[in-house]
């Protein structure tokens, strides 16, 4: 029987069906799963956090190479499947929880202080999970993630393209990102309508950038892209970085214009033309001017 056939048989045996609300697409080919684990560079001393255990296609080859695997799985039916089958190695611990609600700090304590992540992400949580990884980057050395290819392309996009945006900048300023492979729909059950990609995110190798205020950078980037078709003067003025908007709309715009020009940029630019380095520069000058305003 083919891997695809075994997957369908296992699901039927346990009266399971892929759940759309969880974005479940089960990996069916053993060779592909092993290639993904290789991309994650799993070693014998590694404690791995897996997001989305599914039927264990990645879990088993990972466990054979790692010291321990903590598998986070939201679907109660999948948890029961593994309990009944007893198919996972002894060095696998399942965590029945929504990954977006998991306390990464608490989990890291179980994993020696760091979370090395490998994930087959449900398409519906790709962006929220990326932002959660960014938030906890100090305890996540690397993450190997399978997601929609179009999302992977956004994370790797260049300035001036329609794919370039908030996730590109906020992830790109704190990690190196590489696309390792592309997976066709036939690799999954059920078959998605789009291609998937595996990327590696290495938070230990961020680009060389000057020191910057991380929280303020996030605010500047999100504000700049809040209305993509508008100029950075209009979007950043609307964010009221300097004064409460209702009382000081004109003053806010004047200060924003002054700050953008002081950073060396034309106020007529749209956000997608600014590079990561440009946004870091803009953030630094915004911080300087905001501090002067408060004095």
UniProtKB/Swiss-Prot annotation:
Location of this chain's protein in the cell: Cytoplasm
Matching PANTHER family: DIMETHYLADENOSINE TRANSFERASE (PTHR11727), DIMETHYLADENOSINE TRANSFERASE-RELATED (PTHR11727:SF7)
Record's keyword annotation contains Nucleotide-binding: no
Record lineage: Bacteria, Pseudomonadati, Thermodesulfobacteriota, Desulfobulbia, Desulfobulbales
Catalysed reactions listed for this entry: adenosine(1518)/adenosine(1519) in 16S rRNA + 4 S-adenosyl-L-methionine = N(6)-dimethyladenosine(1518)/N(6)-dimethyladenosine(1519) in 16S rRNA + 4 S-adenosyl-L-homocysteine + 4 H(+)
Family: Belongs to the class I-like SAM-binding methyltransferase superfamily. rRNA adenine N(6)-methyltransferase family. RsmA subfamily.
Transmembrane segments: none
Job description of the protein: Specifically dimethylates two adjacent adenosines (A1518 and A1519) in the loop of a conserved hairpin near the 3'-end of 16S rRNA in the 30S particle. May play a critical role in biogenesis of 30S subunits.
Keywords: Cytoplasm, Methyltransferase, RNA-binding, rRNA processing, S-adenosyl-L-methionine, Transferase
Any Gene Ontology CC annotation: cytosol
Domain of life assignment: Bacteria
InterPro entries: KsgA/Erm (IPR001737), rRNA_Ade_diMease-like_C (IPR023165), rRNA_Ade_Mease_Trfase_CS (IPR020596), rRNA_Ade_methylase_Trfase_N (IPR020598), rRNA_adenine_dimethylase (IPR011530), SAM-dependent_MTases_sf (IPR029063)
Any Pfam family: RrnaAD
Protein name: Ribosomal RNA small subunit methyltransferase A
Entry EC no(s): 2.1.1.182
Provenance organism: Desulfotalea psychrophila (strain LSv54 / DSM 12343)
Uppermost EC category: transferase
């Amino acid at each position: 029987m083919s891997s695809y056939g075994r997957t369908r048989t296992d699901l039927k045996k346990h009266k399971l069906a892929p759940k759309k609300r969880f974005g479940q697409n089960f990996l069916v080919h053993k060779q592909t799963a092993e290639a993904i684990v290789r991309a994650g560079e799993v070693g014998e001393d590694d404690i791995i956090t897996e997001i989305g255990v599914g039927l264990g296609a990645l879990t088993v080859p990972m466990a054979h190479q790692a010291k321990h695997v903590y598998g986070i799985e939201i679907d109660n039916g999948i948890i029961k499947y593994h309990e009944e089958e007893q198919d996972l190695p002894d060095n696998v611990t399942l965590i029945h929880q929504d990954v977006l609600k998991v306390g990464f700090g608490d989990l890291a304590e179980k994993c020696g202080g760091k979370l090395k992540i490998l994930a087959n992400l449900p398409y519906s949580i790709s962006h929220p999970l990326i932002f959660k990884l960014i938030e906890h980057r100090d305890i996540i050395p690397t993450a190997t993630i399978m997601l929609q290819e179009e999302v992977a392309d956004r994370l790797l996009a260049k300035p001036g393209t329609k794919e370039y945006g908030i996730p590109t900048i906020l992830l790109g300023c704190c990690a190196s990102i590489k696309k390792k492979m592309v997976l066709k729909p036939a690799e999954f059950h059920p078959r998605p309508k789009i291609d998937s990609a595996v990327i590696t995110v290495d938070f230990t190798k961020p680009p060389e950038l000057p020191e910057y205020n991380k929280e303020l950078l996030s605010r500047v980037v999100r504000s700049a892209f809040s209305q993509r078709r508008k100029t950075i003067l209009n979007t950043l003025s609307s964010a009221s970085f300097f004064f409460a908007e209702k009382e000081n709309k004109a003053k806010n715009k004047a200060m924003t214009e002054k700050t953008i020009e002081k950073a060396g940029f034309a106020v007529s630019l749209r956000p997608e033309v600014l590079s990561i380095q440009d946004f870091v520069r803009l953030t630094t000058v915004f911080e300087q001017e905001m501090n002067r305003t408060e004095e």
